[in-house]
Structures are given as C-alpha cells and as structure tokens.
Amino acid sequence: MSSAPARREKSPKPKAGGKAVFDWQDPLRFDDLLSEDERLVRDAARAYAQDKLMPRVLKAFREEHFDRAILNEMGALGFLGSTIDGYGCAGASYVAYGLVAREIERVDSGFRSAMSVQSSLVMFPIFAFGTEAQRKKYLPKLATGALAGCFGLTEPDVGSDVMGMKARARKVDGGYVLKGSKMWISNAPFADVMVVWAKLDEGGGDTIIG
C-alpha cells in the first residue's frame, strides 16, 4: 500500500509521574497499538478520502452516479483485496484493511461499500474458493481496479437469508445455468465480474455455491 504523511498532530504523551493527557481524537490511545506500517496505511487512506473522495460526494448523490475511476485510484493505492497475498495484492493485515475502510467510511459509506464489495465479497471468495486459473485470471485485474466486481446474494422474497434463497444453479458442460432473482447488488451497474450465490441440487440435497 502507498503511504502519506500524517494529517493530524498527536497529543503529547504524559511524562513519567505526570498527569494523563486526554486526546479527544484518540481517547482510548488506539494509535499506540498500531504498527508503523499500519499508521502509514491509515494516513494514506485518510489523505485520499479527504482530498479525492470528499469533493465527489455531493455530485455522486445528486446525480446518483458512481465515478468508476475511484476503483482504479483505490487499486493504485493497494486498497483493493489488500489482505490477499500475491496476485497483485498488498498482503496487508486485517487491521490495516479495517483502518482503510474506516477512513473511507468517514467520508462516505457508499464509496467504502464499493471497496468492501470488491475486496471482501468478490476477490476473497475467488481467492479462497476459486481455481488457480480463476485466481490468475481475475484477481490481478480486480486488484488494480481494471475489473469491477459485484456480489449477488439478496433476493426479493427472502432477503439475505442464505438458507432460504431460491436461486438455483444447474450444472452443464462448461459451467452452470442460473435461475432466480437477485436485488440490491452493490457495484452491479458497472461490474465486469459477478459472484452470485445459488443452491445446487445434487444427490437430493441442497448445496450452496457462489
């Protein structure tokens, strides 16, 4: 992940035997628990969110439009799929990923959701459950933002209840045929890669696949 200088001054730490100093921006002294690399990642995310994302929030809401270039920018900073090792990903800690998400969420939840869907709901399932060929085909381009991904789980009748979902997948030569309806799919309007949850009926029992 890229780094940037810190954007706020820390309150001074108390000297031995002195009075405790309260930092209203970090009342639990969370910053003291972070590694130097994690602080650099957080500061890079804070600078990006404040300088590049904040000016786009009003336009995004008024025009109901997501600027696709944001994923490319996040990819250049190493924010997409950051906890994955290899395949063009940063291999960062989950703490670092959480810090990035918090800084982007602070500016706009929609922008944070776009990053989280790409990273956690598209890239990680491909990394954890996909074939090596699928990992090599999709992950590097998803990591840079060249490809955008979406995640289809929620259905009109059962919401996000995995056990109750009605979408079905039927195995055919070369893949599966999907039948069913999904809704509220973040990133769907501009997605190139879609991870869709469905039930595969094999041997008389339902098997959930994505």
Which residues does each PLM region occupy?
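Internal helix-loop-helix
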Residues: A76-A148, S186-V193
